[in-house]
């Protein structure tokens, strides 16, 4: 098991190093206008712009720039935003915005899990019954209607029917309700659909039929064998789902005026804020790699096949 995890850790480290190199190199081909505020770019002469870039180290040889960049990462210095949040440390920009995205997305993810998974189990246990029919209807409606229409319906009509705030306010927890509903409603359908499918697939396997013939209690078979194996494909995606919360939700955060990280990368690219673009691309790349690594760790604990291979090796 240790050998397996160390192998995955090594792969993750190599991938992150490659991400740093690729992001650093590509950003050096972006227009240098992204290192100036609008006022600076308009008023500075060419000589002043060159001196400014040289002072920032942008004109240094690539190896020197890379060494300074990596050193800054290790010391927590992510640089400063230039055009989008003039002269504001990027760490402060991310610190202010991530808290909103992380809080709302975590609550939404937890809500979706505690509702969607029991719904999926109930649908599988009552296959072709009332619960399964209603659950399937819910899933079909959620999947067939464009998400933006669902979010708009939730914001406009639920706020009116239940007298809830239409916009998000951090100091008013009641205003969190509609964004959480909007964020979780699709995930509930996803958890229910996939867990139902995996449970039904497990029920049709030979080892379950054999356990039934042996006379084992249905509840024991369901929770000891069927559910345990059916939850594996869902459990392995939980770490990556959790890390994706840090990237926020562009549509929902815009709809409810949530000052989170959703759309921050697009805004920074539009504003040609090179240092902020560099950090965000690196952050999202590192989160993706970390999500895959954490998924491998979860798999090693919940999937008995990984344990068997590890023990045999």
Feature-to-residue mapping (PLM):
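Hydrophobic alpha-helical transmembrane segments of membrane transport/permease proteins
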Residues: 16-67, 163-172
């Amino acid at each position: 098991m240790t050998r397996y995890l160390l192998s995955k850790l090594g792969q993750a480290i190599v991938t992150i190093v490659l991400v740093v190199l690729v992001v650093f190199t590509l950003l050096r081909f972006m227009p240098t206008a992204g290192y100036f505020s609008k006022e600076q770019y308009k008023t500075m002469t060419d000589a002043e712009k060159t001196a400014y870039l040289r002072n920032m180290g942008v004109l240094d040889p690539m190896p020197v720039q890379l060494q300074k960049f990596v050193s800054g990462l290790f010391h927590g210095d992510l640089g400063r935003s230039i055009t989008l949040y003039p002269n504001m440390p990027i760490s402060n920009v991310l610190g202010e915005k991530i808290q909103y995205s992380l809080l709302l997305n975590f609550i939404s993810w937890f809500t979706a899990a505690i509702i969607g998974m029991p719904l999926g189990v109930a649908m599988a246990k009552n296959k072709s019954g009332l619960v399964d029919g209603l659950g399937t209807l819910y899933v079909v409606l959620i999947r067939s209607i464009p998400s933006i229409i669902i979010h708009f319906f939730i914001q406009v009509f639920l706020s009116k029917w239940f007298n809830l705030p239409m916009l998000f306010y951090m100091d008013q927890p009641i205003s969190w309700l509609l964004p959480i509903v909007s964020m979780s409603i699709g995930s509930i359908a996803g958890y229910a659909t996939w867990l139902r499918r995996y449970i039904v697939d497990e029920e049709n396997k030979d080892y379950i039929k054999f356990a039934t013939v042996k006379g084992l209690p249905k509840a024991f078979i369901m929770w000891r064998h069927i559910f345990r194996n059916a939850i594996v494909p869902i459990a392995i995606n939980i770490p990556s789902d959790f890390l994706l919360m840090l990237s926020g939700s562009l549509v929902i955060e815009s709809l409810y005026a949530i000052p989170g990280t959703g759309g921050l990368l697009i805004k920074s690219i539009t504003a040609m804020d090179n240092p902020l673009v560099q950090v965000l691309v690196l952050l999202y790349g590192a989160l993706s790699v970390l999500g895959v690594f954490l998924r491998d760790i979860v798999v090693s604990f919940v999937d008995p096949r990984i344990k068997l291979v590890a023990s045999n090796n």
